[in-house]
Curated annotation (Swiss-Prot):
Pfam family name, one: Ras
Protein name per the record: Ras-related protein RABD2c
S-geranylgeranyl cysteine: lipidated positions: C199, C200
Transmembrane segments: none
InterPro entries in the record: P-loop_NTPase (IPR027417), Rab (IPR050227), Small_GTP-bd (IPR005225), Small_GTPase (IPR001806)
Gene, per the UniProt record: RABD2C
Family indicated by similarity: Belongs to the small GTPase superfamily. Rab family.
Subcellular location, record wording: Cell membrane; Golgi apparatus, trans-Golgi network membrane; Golgi apparatus membrane
UniProt-annotated binding residues for GTP: 15-23, 33-40, 63-67, 121-124, 151-153
Keyword field: Cell membrane, ER-Golgi transport, Golgi apparatus, GTP-binding, Lipoprotein, Membrane, Nucleotide-binding, Prenylation, Protein transport, Transport
Length: 202
């Protein structure tokens, strides 16, 4: 057991290109914001350790590229994820309409009980908003997914989004039978996964 943390959670940020996934990650992990937009090539990740209910939780947050051409690369990163934050841009209707497609990706590649959170980013751009809070909330409620509107630019609800996801995963892990207290060890039907047999060896 690593004494530095009690839990290690892998989180994914997914959604269309340009919705602000990298900005959300930068705001949460480094409390910084970049106005200039640089498209993420492939996958990038950051780590932040948080305290919750007296437990130290290490969050490994992966920023997956939104472009269609990277879909095959990022599909492997769904595996092993504890939580997935599906992000859209409140000023871009297409990015919201594509949320269904991203949820299909989750159903296809992620584990069955993975935690999900719907996030509408760029809520500071009120005059340009085209996806109403009510529409998004109704959509999320229909699917049984928590929903928050965020702004990476002014930090609105960014901390809340990641901490809510962390709490939900922690609750789920605690309610699971055997092995719940040792999250760094992934168990599949009671068998520890061999750390040596990586899928990247080919």
């Amino acid at each position: 057991m690593n004494p530095e943390y009690d839990y290690l959670f892998k989180l994914l940020l997914i959604g269309d290109s340009g919705v602000g996934k990298s900005c959300l990650l930068l705001r949460f992990a480094d409390d910084s914001y970049l106005d200039s937009y640089i498209s993420t090539i492939g996958v990038d990740f950051k780590i932040r350790t948080v305290e919750q209910d007296g437990k130290t939780i290490k969050l490994q947050i992966w920023d997956t590229a939104g472009q269609e051409r990277f879909r095959t690369i990022t599909s492997s990163y769904y595996r092993g994820a504890h939580g997935i934050i599906v992000t859209y841009d409140v000023t871009d209707l297409e990015s919201f309409n594509n949320v269904k497609q991203w949820l299909n990706e989750i159903d296809r590649y992620a584990s069955e009980n993975v935690n999900k959170l719907l996030v509408g980013n760029k809520c500071d751009l009120t005059s340009q908003k085209v996806v109403s809070t009510e529409t998004a909330k109704a959509f999320a409620d229909e699917l049984g997914i928590p929903f928050l509107e965020t702004s990476a630019k002014n930090a609105t609800n960014v901390e809340e989004a990641f901490m809510a996801m962390t709490a939900a995963i922690k609750t789920r892990m605690a309610s699971q039978p055997a092995g719940g207290s040792k999250p760094p060890t992934v168990q599949i039907r009671g068998q520890p996964v061999n750390q040596q047999s990586g899928c990247c060896s080919s």
